[in-house]
Amino acid sequence: YSKKTQTPICCSAMGLSSVPYDYELYLGMIGMHGTPVANYATLNADLVIAIGARFSDRVAGNRKKFANAAQIIHIDIDASEISKNVACDTALVGDAKQILTHFINQIEEQKHEEWRNTLVDFRTKIGLKKPAEGDKVDPRDFIYTLHKLLGDDAIIVTDVGQHQMITAQYYQYAKPRSFISSCGLGTMGYGMGAAIGVKTAHPNRPVVLITGDGSFHMNMNEMAC
């Protein structure tokens, strides 16, 4: 759908890795910890198609002002999620793949060159903050470099905390379901068990757990065993 209509895409934290980082119309993560261009696009869009989104406070912020210039189409397989946090204009309850396939078959190709150029220009001028030059290790630079070393096949698991958001922001996800994190419940100590489960399911792919001091403290006893 995005390719046919030249529609930009942004993701919530739970949606990261569903779109390859190098896709030309991908704007990155939205919300409190998101990229400036993703938030700019949402604020200035005249149509927002939300797929499986719950519009958490980290995404929507002030829910009464979220994308208030746009018509919102909310697609979700669970009817109870529709307009739960942010009121939508059109609700479509069902399987996202089937609904989007129907969209693709019904809509004509579009370009939206002016809108696309505006976002490209904005992204070029205002991006995520880059680590400062110096001899100190910056977590953002560490995460960015980690992707270079691991490549696109790795699955990244995080615990909960600042490291989680830095990993969400700066790691570059190329394959679906390569970012695993407890974003909704925010359960510290989640990471080790999740990483073991992921490795069991994908024994031939690199699996890396990125954790913080609090979450590490919750799992020290398991590591000692």
Q: Model-found features: residue ranges?
A:
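General beta-strand structural signal in soluble alpha/beta enzymes
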Residues: 10-12, 50-51, 94, 134, ...
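Conserved catalytic cysteine-centered active-site region
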Residues: 10-23, 172, 202-204
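Short, solvent-exposed amphipathic alpha-helical segments in soluble enzyme
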Residues: 1-6, 63-68, 90-91, 170-175, ...
